[in-house]
Amino acid sequence: MPVIELRDGAFPNRGNWTEEQTKLAFHFYCQTPFGQLHGRNPKVVALAGLIERTPDALAMKCCNIASLDPAMRGRGVSGLGNASAMDRRVWDEFHADWDTLALECEAMLESLRVKDAQPPVDSDLADELADVPQDFFGETRRAFVNRRVRQAFFRRAVLSGYGNRC
């Protein structure tokens, strides 16, 4: 994942949310079931630290984004009703273009991790390792496969949309 140059002032800790913060909140929202959007979720806490917002502020931003989601409204979930013009603009920009959102946000996250001296995270590898059985005995075979780019983001977005059930 390429590291990109983050603009000065992109991550203020108070006041209006920037476009970068809103995009990263939207990226997180796409991958997280609605019931997990709260300030005590360790993933919310971790991302909030990177984007210099409080966990509760990030959770509320995600719930504001949920108010724009027709799938949530269809389930009777209204989210919070304070979506900003920035929330709407980011929703409109990326709703039909997941690839651009995933690439841009993962590059921003990687840049934030580098800036904060955190180890890089290969989300595809982390997802694969989570499914590794504890019994490491078995046969080996050689395989050549094509692998979808940004598969981990796509998988988390789909699972989040279906309540972690397919």
Model-derived features: positions:
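Major-groove recognition helix of helix-turn-helix-like DNA-binding domains
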Residues: 53-69
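Short helix->loop/beta-hairpin flanking segments within DNA-binding domains
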Residues: 29-39
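Intrinsically disordered, low-complexity linkers and terminal tails enriched in Pro/Gly
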Residues: 10, 106-137
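Short alpha-helical "recognition helix" segments of helix-turn-helix
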Residues: 43-49
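Short, amphipathic alpha-helical interaction segments positioned at domain boundaries
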Residues: 88-107
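Short, Lys/Arg-enriched anionic-surface-contact patches
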Residues: 7-28
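Short Lys/Arg-enriched helix C-cap and helix-to-coil transition segments
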Residues: 70-90
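Short, charged surface segments at domain edges that flank catalytic/cofactor-binding sites
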Residues: 126-165
